[in-house]
């Protein structure tokens, strides 16, 4: 896997760890990653750079291999906030090839960086601070002091529903990923096993040989979820 440019014995995070390692190691000026549940933001944090997951629909997903379609987004990985804004402005355009594409709303982000933050409200969920390491907590508190000195209003609030976020994420992500991976059957595109007896044998061998063990476990584990969601959620959608 990709190594952390600041310490080769450490990982770069994932899943967009390769691009974060390249940008953090000054191999690339910027990069694009895909983020479903932190895959841009986590490696960017590990490598000491800026990673942004845009609002859903702001950036076209056309060409991205889908994992969980309702959560996937493409975003910039850069060494500064200014660069992130410039790259985001360049990629946040409406694309008719993506049915969920909305494009950027409002003024270009790079232009808004010149504005001060006086009077802006910045919310911090108390639950996010639970279990945070002391040095990380101090870094957050130091950042809060900077924002306050610049005129921002810091608001601490409770988010009790946060405890459901992870299980809900895994239910939706696994079910959608399992469905999306169903297209890789060796018929249209992707890997195809060279030896098979019939169509069923070809599909079974293709998916067994082409998918790693972790992906196979995900597909099998998600099947009951897909059936349950399709039955109970039919009227909602």
Task: List where the protein language model places each region.
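Acidic, glycine-rich active-site loops and adjacent beta-strand->loop/helix elements
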Residues: 36-40, 44-46, 128, 160-161, ...
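Acyltransferase
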Residues: 108-111, 132-159, 189-194, 205-206, ...
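Short glycine/serine-rich loop segments
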Residues: 1-91
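A short helix-breaking turn/cap at a secondary-structure junction
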Residues: 53-141, 200-205
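Short glycine-enriched loop/turn motifs at secondary-structure junctions
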Residues: 67-71, 163-165, 237
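Short glycine/threonine-rich loop-to-helix capping motif typified by GTGT followed
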Residues: 166-175
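Short helix-loop capping/hinge segments that flank enzyme active sites or metal/cofactor-binding pockets
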Residues: 116-123, 175-237
């Amino acid at each position: 896997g990709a190594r952390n440019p600041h310490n080769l014995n450490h990982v770069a995070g994932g899943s967009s760890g390769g691009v974060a390692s390249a940008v953090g190691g000054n191999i690339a000026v910027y990069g694009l990653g895909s983020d479903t549940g932190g895959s841009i933001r986590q490696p960017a944090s590990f490598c000491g750079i800026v990673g942004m997951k845009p609002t859903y629909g702001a950036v076209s997903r056309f060409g991205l291999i889908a994992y969980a379609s309702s959560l996937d987004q493409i975003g910039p990985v850069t060494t500064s906030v200014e660069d992130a804004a410039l790259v985001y402005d360049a990629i946040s355009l409406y694309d008719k090839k993506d049915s969920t594409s909305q494009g950027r709303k409002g003024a270009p982000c790079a232009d808004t960086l010149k504005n001060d933050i006086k009077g802006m409200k910045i919310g911090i969920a108390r639950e996010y601070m639970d279990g945070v390491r002391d040095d990380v907590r101090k870094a957050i508190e130091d950042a809060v002091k900077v924002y306050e000195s610049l005129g921002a209003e810091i608001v601490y609030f409770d988010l009790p529903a946060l405890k459901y976020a992870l299980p809900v994420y895994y239910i939706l992500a696994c079910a959608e990923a399992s469905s999306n991976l169903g297209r890789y059957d060796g018929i249209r595109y992707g890997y195809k096993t060279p030896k098979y007896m019939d169509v069923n044998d070809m599909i079974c061998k293709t998916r067994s040989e082409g998918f790693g063990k972790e992906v196979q476990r995900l597909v099998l584990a998600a099947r009951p979820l897909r059936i349950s969601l399709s039955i109970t959620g039919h009227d909602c959608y």
